Design a protein with these regions (language model features):
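Sec-dependent signal peptide recognition
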Residues: 1-8
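C-terminal motif of bacterial Sec signal peptides marking the signal peptidase cleavage site
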Residues: 13-16
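Bacterial signal peptide processing site
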Residues: 18-21
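Propeptide-to-catalytic entry region of secreted or membrane-anchored zinc metalloproteases
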Residues: 24-144, 148-155
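Active-site-proximal segment of zinc-dependent metalloprotease catalytic domains
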Residues: 48-49, 133-217
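Stable alpha-helical elements in mature extracytoplasmic
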Residues: 75-87, 128, 198-202, 206, ...
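The catalytic-center signature of Zn2+-dependent metalloproteases
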Residues: 183-264
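Short, solvent-exposed mixed-charge patches
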Residues: 271-272
């Protein structure tokens, strides 16, 4: 897909979330600090929810920044079942099937060389796309590219992940996950917590890529947190602007759906 617009740089939510650990900076625990949204081409979401019949994830990871795989210790479910279940739910009840494919093992993902960066500019992140993206998309099938890197976003150290769209030539939105930021959720006493945080983050970013909240999928009810850009006012929703340790700790992979009813209503009532 070719986007015809310039990019708007939107500082939606520079996070200043207290994490309760004196040795860590208070900006660490939060969700997106910025999103890149397209000025025009609103058909981005309308394609995903009309003509697309298959969706998969093309995942790459920098050496030593690999995603968590395997099973959760508590409950034993597959870690990537969280992302898969939420995507399956997104495309359920549309009157036609959409095949969703989510890789669950590192053998299904692409390891890329260590980039030796402690900070990343947006352009440096985008340089990875033509080098390592393996799959293309069309109006029948969509492949979202997710890249795990070490380091942090320059001038925004609290960013856990970022979704970039609207850039000529990159295709569908690209998600970058900063593994160093994810690891701030690590806890020896609760080894599943960092894995849950990573999956909640990936699912949140995919929500943005698909068009939530009011970023392509129109609002069915008034629930956009305009102070934080395209995020939901429902603090229990996976599209809320911040992710706290408590929220991650209480999340159960046995009940993997993280989008609140407001966001799910947006999707269910969107028929482009």
């Amino acid at each position: 897909m070719i986007f015809r617009a310039l990019i708007i740089l939107s500082f939606f939510s520079l996070i200043n979330c207290e994490n309760g650990k004196s040795e860590l900076p208070p900006v660490v625990l939060g969700y997106i600090a910025l999103d890149y949204l397209i000025l025009t081409d609103p058909d981005r979401s309308s394609v995903y929810f009309s003509t697309v019949r298959s969706l998969d994830l093309d995942i790459a990871y920098e050496t030593d920044a690999e995603p968590f795989t395997g099973n959760y210790i508590v409950g034993g479910s597959n870690i990537w079942n969280v992302t898969d279940s939420n995507l399956q739910d997104v495309f359920a009840d549309r009157g036609y099937p959409v095949a969703v494919t989510v890789p669950t093992d590192l053998s299904e993902m692409n390891e890329i060389p260590n980039q030796n960066r402690s900070t990343w500019s947006v352009n440096q992140l985008l340089d990875l796309v033509p080098r390592y993206r393996k799959k293309s998309s069309n109006f029948q099938s969509t492949s979202f590219f997710i890249v795990y890197v070490r380091g942090q976003l320059a001038d925004a150290p609290g960013v856990i992940a970022v979704t970039i769209s609207g850039v000529l030539g990159i295709g569908p939105p690209v998600i970058f996950v900063f593994k160093d930021m994810i690891e701030q959720f690590s806890n020896i006493a609760s080894p599943d917590r960092v894995k849950k945080a990573e999956q909640m983050t990936v699912t949140h970013e995919l929500g943005h890529a698909l068009g939530l909240v009011n970023a392509g999928i129109p609002l069915y009810s008034s629930h956009q947190d305009k102070d934080h850009g395209n995020h939901c006012t429902n603090s229990s929703c996976g599209m809320f602007w911040a992710l706290s340790e408590t929220k991650v700790e209480t999340f159960s992979p046995a009940s993997p759906l993280i989008f609140g009813q407001e966001c799910r209503d947006d999707i269910r009532n969107y028929n482009p």
